[in-house]
Structures are given as C-alpha cells and as structure tokens.
C-alpha cells in the first residue's frame, strides 16, 4: 500500500489515462502497478497501444506547453504538471514509446511520503 497524497496521485493517473485515451483510437489502455527493485518504492504505469511518441517528442514531452501535435485539445500543460506533482511526492516519471506501437508512462514513488 501507499501512504501519499492520494488526491495528487489520482490527478496524475487520471491525466495519464486521459492522454492515453486521446491517442489510442484502436487498441487498449492498461493501468496498473508493480513492485520496484527497491522495496521502498512502487511503480504505477499507464500503457497504451496508440500512435506512440517520436524520439523528438519524448525529449520534450514534459516541457510546459509542448504538444506532440496541433490537432488535439489541450494546452500542453498536463504532463508538465504530472512531473511536478510526482517530484513533490519524491518520485520520478518516465516514458517509453515506439511510434505506431504505443506508449508507457511509469511513475515511481516511495511507498511512504507524507
């Protein structure tokens, strides 16, 4: 179990799921958690089989106002806000992706963060 700011963590997860839904017309979205190599941490992930993000996009994905395209709604702030929240929870967020195959966002946070 996690002892953390549940409201903020839920905000992060909701944003990641909404982003996955925005870029996954066909396929699936998976949400879950897994043990970390360090037993003091947990990893939460949102994975999709959507369009994927280019290497260039990955380099900028957490920058404020960055959008991978100009066709979708949003101001390009969501992932930047997610990163700020995760860092305040003393965690990290990272992304792996392959164009045409999908994307996985992973949040690694300590089990106890008050």
Q: Could you describe each region identified by the protein language model?
A:
Residues 1-4:
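Conserved micro-motifs of the catalytic ATP-binding
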Residues 20-21:
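Short helix-loop "hinge" at the ATP-lid/N-box region of the Bergerat-fold HATPase_c
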Residues 28-39:
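Short beta-strand/loop element within the Bergerat-fold HATPase_c
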Residues 48:
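Acidic ATP/Mg2+-coordinating residue in the GHKL
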Residues 53-65:
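Short conserved segment of the HATPase_c
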Residues 78, 82:
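Short alpha-helical Gxxx[C/S/T] motif in the catalytic ATP-binding
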């Amino acid at each position: 179990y996690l002892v953390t700011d549940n409201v903020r963590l839920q905000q992060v997860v909701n944003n990641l799921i909404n982003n996955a839904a925005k870029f996954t017309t066909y396929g699936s979205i998976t949400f879950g958690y897994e043990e970390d190599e360090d037993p003091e941490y947990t990893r939460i992930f949102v994975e999709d089989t959507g369009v994927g993000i280019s290497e260039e996009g990955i380099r900028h994905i957490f920058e404020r106002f960055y959008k991978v395209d100009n066709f979708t709604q949003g101001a390009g702030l969501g992932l930047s806000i997610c990163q700020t929240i995760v860092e305040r929870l003393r965690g990290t967020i990272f992304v792996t992706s392959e164009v045409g195959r999908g994307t996985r966002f992973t949040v690694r946070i300590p089990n106890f963060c008050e």
